[in-house]
Amino acid sequence: MREALLQEAMDGRVRCNACERRCTLIPGGFGWCRTRQNRGGKLVTLIYGSVSSLAANPIEKKPFYHFYPGTKALTAGSWSCNFGCPWCQNWDISKSPPPAKGDYLSPQRFIDSVERTGCQGTSISFNEPTLSLEWSVEVFRLAKQSGFYNTYVTNGYMTPEASSLLINSGLEAMNVDIKGDAPSVKKFCKMVDVDRVWAAAKLARSRGVHIEITTLVIPAVNDSDLVLHGIAERIAGELGREVPWHATSYFPAYHFTAPPTPMQTLERAWQIGKEAGLEFVYLGNVAGHRYDNTYCPACGTLLIRRLGFEVVEYRLDAGKCRQCGRSIPGVWGNR
C-alpha cells in the first residue's frame, strides 16, 4: 500500500485524479476500480507492486510494430480495471479486485528481472496500467537509468496529470485501445467518454511518445462501416496518417458470446483504414495474414514480414525502405 500520487483533498473526502473517472471517495470508500481507497482523508493505492502476471513478451505482442521490432519487453500486470467491457480478453485479472495480500514485486527487482531475462524494455499491460501509476513511475525512472525502453498498453482513460507523470518518468511508447464510437463505448464500457481517450493519445503524441492504436473488432458492437470509418478518420486527422492502426480479431470471452470476428470484417476494416489515408493498417490475431506485415507506403515493397509475434524478414536500413529510400515512421534499430 502506498499513498497515491494524484489526489485532491475535499473535507474528509478525496478525489482521485489518476483516471478520467475522477472518483470522489468518502472516508473508507473505494474508487470505481476498487484499487484506491480513502484512508483517513488520504488516497492510497492498494496494488503498488502487486503483480498478477509477469512475462517476457515479444514487443509485437503488445502490439507494437513500429517500435524496436524483434525485441522483448518484460511485461507486468496487476488487478482490476476502470472500464467494464463485457468481452474482456483478460477478464480473470481485470475483473478481479486486488487480493488482500498479493505477490509484491519492487520496482528494482522488476528492473533486475528485465536484465536477467534478456529483455530490452518494460511494458505495463494485461490489466489497465493507469491503476498502477505509482509503481509505473518508479519502474520507468529506474528503467531509463538502466537503458531500457518503457511502454504502456492502455485503454487511454488517463488524466493529463497522469500522462505527464508517466512521460516525465520515461514513457516512450503507448498502444491505445480505441474501443469504438461514443455510443458503443458508453453502452458497453460503463459510461466513459471516448473523447478523453483520444485526448490522452494526442497529448502523448505531442510530447514525443510513439503511439499505435488498436481496435478489437467485435460483431454488432463496433464492426459497422460507420464506426470503423470514424475511428480511421480520427486517427488520420487527429494523430497522423503515419500512426499504425491494428484491427484485431475478437474471440468470445467473459460475458460476451458473439462469434469470432469474420475475416471478411477484418479485411473490410483494413480497406477502410486505407481509404481514410492511413499508411500502416494491420490485422491482428490472424497469424500469417499478409496484412500482418509492413509494406512501404511509397513503393509497396515488403519491409517487415511477421509470423505470429516473430519477425522473419526485416528490410529496413536506418529506418528507410531499401528499395526506394522512403523514411518509415517509427523507432527502429536493435537494443
Language-model regions: role of each:
Residues 32-42, 47-54, 98-110, 310-322, ...:
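Short cysteine/histidine-rich metal-coordination sites, predominantly Zn2+-binding motifs
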